[in-house]
Amino acid sequence: MHTAATILDAVVRHIDATGFAAHGIHVRTRTAAPGTDDVAERHWTPDVRREVHSAAKGVCVLAAGIAADDGLVDLDEPIATYLAGTGLGTQTGLLLGDGVDRVTLRHLLTMTSGIDMPWSATELTDWPDLAAEFLRRPSRGRVFQYANASTYTAMRVLETRVGDVGAFVTERLFAPLGLRDVEWQRCPNGFVAAGEGLSLRTEELARIGHLIRDRGVVDGQRIVSARWCDAMHTDWVEREGTGPGYERYAMAGWGGPGRLWRLHGAYGQMLLFDETEASNAPGTVVTITADDHFGADALAAFVADELARQDRRR
């Protein structure tokens, strides 16, 4: 039976052998005793807060889910409903592109708004208001188009109902998880960067993974409904012509590699979830922070293969 230590040892050996530029790794897996976990971790660099990049999109999904649980938003209602009269806060005369009046928060969080906006390192400052620029562009229907601007716009819409999203997440998500004084980058207009700009330690990112694995409950306290954690790895949007691990996308989650699904940020920030029935310890979460953009996919594939190998040795 594999343990957190056996998983950790195998992944550490692989990282050291391949030269993957890891900052830290945290492994959490269930034990044979009901309701208990086994945990192990290793650090190669000082355990300080670093940006988790697109892994922050999972936090945005949790924020939207909490607001939906409160009855403040409906993820399947057109966002035009929330923008009527108030706009985005920075302007009330908001112009929507053709077809955008039918776009919902779910579409924005699953990257299926059909609005095309290529990524730019300076996108938060390229326009007076990124969300307004995004929404004025036409929608091609329910077409997958990955864009940081999509998540950013979702959080701007959410802001019309919950107030400052950073404050809302701090109170309703970070505080129950024991996360204090978390920094989240803001745009020039004062709104959180949403799908990027969030800085966490390896173990802090792992706490979010723990919450997601346990379907919205931590230490017996429900923070968000299970359906929003499930939405990160169900109802996949299928993609064609892409590499392994990028063929399926849900609400912030990528399907694969292999038996895994994951939240994946640039430069190797990953929450790798193994919840298959084939696992002898279903519920394993491997958290990785790194500075190795091009080696991350191979490392995730190794983790998937190693979990399968350790299962076969049981």
Predicted regions and their residues:
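Active-site SXXK
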Residues: E51-D76, L108, A154-L158, I208
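A short, well-structured edge-of-sheet supersecondary motif
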Residues: H2-P46, L272, P282-T287
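Active-site Gly/Thr loop motif
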Residues: D181-E183, A226-I288, H293
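Non-transmembrane alpha-helical segments in soluble domains
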Residues: V12, G65, A80, R106-L109, ...
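Active-site helix/loop module of the DD-peptidase/beta-lactamase fold
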Residues: D70-M111, T160-L200
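Short, gly/Ser/Thr-rich active-site loops of penicillin-recognizing serine hydrolases
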Residues: D297-R314
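Active-site-proximal alpha-helical segments within enzyme catalytic domains
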Residues: T153-V157, E196-V217, Q269-D291
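Catalytic-site signature segments of enzymes, centered on catalytic residues
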Residues: P46-D47, I115-G197
